[in-house]
A protein has these predicted regions:
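Cytochrome P450 proximal C-terminal region
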Residues: 2-7, 12, 43, 133, ...
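Cytochrome P450 heme-thiolate monooxygenase catalytic core
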Residues: 2-13, 39, 80-91, 105, ...
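N-terminal membrane-proximal hinge/A-helix region immediately C-terminal to the signal-anchor transmembrane segment
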Residues: 2-94, 101-108, 123, 127-135, ...
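Conserved cytochrome P450 K-helix E-x-x-R motif and the immediately C-terminal K′/meander segment
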Residues: 28-47, 218, 222, 306-347
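Conserved cytochrome P450 K-helix/beta-meander segment immediately N-terminal to the heme-binding cysteine loop
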Residues: 76, 359-387, 468-469
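Cytochrome P450 heme-thiolate "Cys pocket" and heme-binding signature region
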Residues: 94-95, 108, 264, 269, ...
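Cytochrome P450 fold signature focused on the C-terminal beta-domain
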Residues: 231-236, 296-316, 329-349, 358, ...
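Cytochrome P450 catalytic-core helices
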Residues: 273-298, 409-424
Length: 496
């Protein structure tokens, strides 16, 4: 029998301490206004654990790496991905994608598509990633101002749709990116998400997401119908889904809705997190020019003017450190929720069935007792020669345990190839005074799109040129110079 909110309320004296909740709404106000700052302040004030209330329902916040291991790795079956607040799984509005299903159903369907993410299969996607990235670069020119947020969303959507579903969406990237932005970008605050508010009208975040989802339904169901009429085996995720066994009864296949929800999940999660990781990385590199110069030096030394290949990536260790550090500071997946499915005891605290538990990458990735200069962007901390020991569970941008993001190898390869290809040619430089802000929804997005001027790439031996270029760019922006005039000046400066 499901545990009710009222029953959970009776256990509040057994849970860890936390700030006093307001009647009826609990801590919804700080969760809505500044969830990132609120979670960090709770950790500083209460230490390893804290309890807050989402309305009348308690949520236990776990702030230590050992808690991450306990929940995600050591006892994953004690913690469900769905809770009593999320409604009946038979609800037609409940997603049946890999991110939301649980138990044996999740294990069975994950196994069905796992071959698409094996090492050799993922490596076969490298040619597609590089092809689409080079096609994008051919449309860019030094001096152009580019919406990097939008460009990375469309590029990663283009790549994931081809790699996983063998479809070329080049003619539909704009509308599809808008639709996914409607699902993810209009995702509600942490407070509304935790309450699972489902009011389908144009005002609510849920209503906006539903409207955007309906735009994608026609594309996805058409794709399924076309594949059913196609006898070829594409050896892609869609083929695997269509031949996968259902978990309800032996010999059954996945339903149309289940296949639809898997496709939607892979398309959304498969492009959004990588795009955000890249945007945050470009922003950090603009704030730490010494890191950017060192990375571009490494790229230039290894590639010697060639387009990057899969084999080149093994010779770019600093690239990996930069991406690791970027996802430590600005993890695209910044929060993970679980619900206690089997009564558990953690650090002497009893967690009753139905209790919501919260693990935050944003907080744990910044714990000062684990990360020296935790707020600083220091890729060198990932150099094995430095001897820094990172405890298991202290870094989990892709989750952990049996629910580790299935697309992690693909996302890592994609980010490495895209970042290398762009930095080989350009240095994206945001306008002076640009402040990204935070939009912590399903993912941790910059609140303001990153619009950047494409400076020609350079290395440490041309740093004086960079200073001159930066001054020229600042002057052009301040004086409102015409874009073409600014571009011509940039090209002239570099003799292009």
């Amino acid at each position: 029998m499901a545990t009710t909110a009222q029953e959970l309320q009776t256990t509040k004296t057994m849970l860890p301490p936390g700030p006093r909740p307001l009647p009826y709404i609990g801590h919804l106000l700080p969760l809505r206004q500044d969830p990132l700052g609120f979670l960090q302040q709770l950790q500083r004030t209460y230490g390893n654990m804290a309890t807050i209330y989402v309305g009348k329902n308690p949520a236990v916040l776990l702030f230590r790496p050992e808690h991450v291991r306990y929940v995600l790795v050591e006892h994953p079956r004690h913690f469900s991905n769905r809770g009593v607040l999320q409604g009946n799984s038979e609800d037609n509005n409940t997603s049946e994608g890999l991110l939301t299903i649980d138990g044996e159903k999740h294990r069975q369907q994950r196994r069905a598509v796992q071959p698409a993410f094996h090492k050799k299969q993922v490596e076969s996607y490298a040619a597609i990633m590089e092809q689409y990235t080079q096609e994008l670069l051919k449309t860019w020119h030094a001096g152009d101002t580019v919406d990097m947020s939008r460009a990375m969303q469309e590029l990663t959507l283009h790549i994931v749709s081809k790699c996983l579903f063998s479809i070329d969406l080049s003619s539909q990237l704009g509308p599809l990116s808008d639709a996914f932005d409607g699902i993810i970008g209009t995702s509600t605050s942490m407070a509304e998400s935790l309450l699972n508010i489902r009011i389908d009208n144009p005002i609510t975040g849920y209503g906006k997401r539903m409207a955007a989802s309906r735009q994608l339904d026609m594309l996805i169901y058409t794709l399924i119908a076309q594949r059913r009429d196609d006898d070829r085996d594409y050896h892609d995720v869609l083929s695997m889904l269509m031949s996968a066994q259902g978990a309800e009864e032996p010999g059954t296949k996945l339903t149309e809705k289940q296949i639809h929800d898997h496709i939607l999940t892979f398309l959304a999660a498969g492009h959004e997190t990588t795009a955000i990781a890249l945007v945050w990385t470009f922003y950090l590199l603009s704030q730490y020019p010494q890191v950017r110069i060192k990375l571009q030096d490494e790229i230039r030394s290894v590639l010697a003017g060639r387009e990057p290949t899969l084999d080149d990536l093994a010779r770019l260790p600093y690239l990996d450190w930069v991406l690791n550090e970027s996802m430590r500071l600005y993890p695209p997946a910044w929060l993970q929720l679980r619900f206690v499915a089997k009564e558990s005891e953690l650090d002497g605290v009893r967690l009753p069935v139905g209790t919501m538990v919260v693990l935050s990458q944003w907080v744990i990735h910044r714990l000062p007792d684990i990360w020296q200069e935790a707020e600083a962007f220091k890729p060198e901390r990932w150099d094995p020669a430095n001897g820094q020991q990172i405890p298991p569970g202290a870094y989990f941008p892709f989750g952990g345990g049996p629910r580790t993001c299935i697309g992690m190898p693909l996302a890592q390869l994609e980010a490495r190839l895209i970042l290398t290809s762009i930095l080989q040619h350009y240095t994206p430089q945001p306008a002076p005074g640009y402040t990204p802000g935070f939009q912590p929804v399903i993912t941790l997005r910059p609140k303001q799109h990153l619009r950047a001027t494409l400076m020609p790439a350079f290395s440490s031996d041309s740093d004086a040129q960079w200073q001159q270029l930066a001054r020229l760019n600042d002057k052009a922006i301040q004086e409102g110079a015409e874009r073409q005039g600014c571009r011509n000046a940039l090209l002239s400066l570099f003799g292009l």
